[in-house]
Amino acid sequence: MYCRGHELRKKLCEQYDIKPIGRFKLLNGRTVISDAGNMDITDEYIIFDCISKTDHNHHESIYCGKYVAEDLCKITGYSLPQLFNPLHYEHSSHGYGGKGSTNSSPKWNPVRKQLYDIVLLIITYQGNIKINSKIFDIKRELEDPKYIEYYPKLQIRSVNTYLIKMNKTFENIIADLQNNNNLRTFKYDLVLDYMEKNNISQHLK
């Protein structure tokens, strides 16, 4: 959804509940088109889910860089999400406080956390994908605080199916992203063990 200019962003925030749902580091050679002027973003990008205030079934999306994202968050009061950065040499940064912020980190189930990182890396790999994509549904389910301490059996099956439809294994994705990128290590041994114990066929490697 086009969002260039502060005044337009203010009007959009009157019409939509504009909530950030992800913030991702772009790797070498990858770009995302900004909705604030159709320019290529080359560093990091933020995804917003925009829900109509008059029809909650109507969703739009905004993909933008940090400057525009900070402006939207100042208007709405939401927090800028933590940056997902899969690289070794930079540290993830956090947003400022606001709606949706918390003072303490939730205690993740370790299998769920590994699967969550897998999902974030898939989104990083795919880039400019629609927010109604199944992978975003899985992301929302995994980060739901009501279930964050539980094993993600359903979501594991969903990720497996998603990878099959991509015709990629998670190992393939890691190998592709390692080209020209100092990618940090992403473990998924706990997910594999859980799948084996529950007789779930895997498409991770």
Briefly describe each language-model feature range.
Residues 1-205:
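Extended, alpha-helix-rich binding/interface surfaces that flank or overlap catalytic cores
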